[in-house]
Design a protein with these regions (language model features):
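Proline- and acidic/polar-enriched loop/turn elements at helix boundaries
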Residues: 26, 63-65, 87, 111, ...
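Non-catalytic C-terminal accessory region of glycerolipid acyltransferases
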Residues: 93-190
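Small-molecule pocket liners
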Residues: 19, 58, 155-157
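A conditional alpha-helix N-cap/helix-loop micro-motif detector
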Residues: 86-89, 121
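Catalytic core of membrane glycerolipid acyltransferases/transacylases, capturing the structured
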Residues: 3, 9, 16, 30-87, ...
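Low-complexity, charge- and small-residue-enriched intrinsically disordered regions
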Residues: 17-26
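Soluble or luminal CAZymes and related metallo-dependent hydrolases
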Residues: 2, 6, 88, 169, ...
Length: 190
């Protein structure tokens, strides 16, 4: 937590200064309680962008390959949860569930990887929807639009109203999540 706060105070302002991200829909971010933020994935900088919008610590779900070597300690210090994408990683979901049970925040990119296709979004994997169905945490969709450039069209993140998860199965939650993000990107012309 200390390391995360240190970065928030010193690194995040530098990020904001360089990229001047535009943030829309802040009113859709719950002030307290367990939250799952889920949206499209364009760049390694997406995690930094999402973290700059929130004061509370975000525990990101990230591919386990990032935890090899010296970088592993860095990601662990940030509270990042490693995910083995080659299998259905029950231990990663269990660790995320523990974060949510304590009222924490999970950040996840359900596409599972950077979207380098011409599609608006790649098909979402079911992990975010499963976590939401199981935990009943607020599931807040977001869409990242634009580019991380110092000059020109700036990157933008837009948060949408939380998806209702009570009394719903993971499939219907996942369908609504993917459609919300897709529509947000299509309306913003990505």
């Amino acid at each position: 937590m200390f390391f995360y706060r240190f970065l928030y105070v010193f690194i995040w302002p530098l990020f904001r200064l360089l990229f001047h991200p535009k943030v829309r829909g802040r009113e859709n971010i719950p002030k307290s309680g367990a939250i799952i933020f889920a949206g499209n994935h364009k760049s390694n900088l997406d995690c930094v962008l999402l973290a700059t919008c929130l004061w509370r610590q975000v525990h990101f779900m990230a591919k386990d390959e990032l935890f090899r070597g010296a970088a592993g300690g860095f990601f662990r210090a940030l509270g990042t949860i490693p995910v083995n994408r080659r299998i259905r990683d029950a231990s990663a979901l269990s660790e995320a569930q523990k974060v949510l049970e304590t009222g924490g925040i999970i950040g996840i990119f359900p596409e599972g990887s950077f979207n380098r296709t011409k599609e608006t979004v790649m098909p979402f994997k079911p992990g975010a929807a499963r976590m939401a169905a199981r935990s009943h945490a607020a599931l807040v969709p977001f869409a990242i639009k634009g580019k991380y450039t110092v000059i020109g069209r700036r990157v933008e993140i837009e948060f949408y109203p939380a998806i209702e998860t009570a009394e719903r199965d993971a499939a219907s939650i996942g369908h609504e999540l993917e459609n919300t993000v897709r529509e947000g990107l299509e309306n913003g012309k990505r």
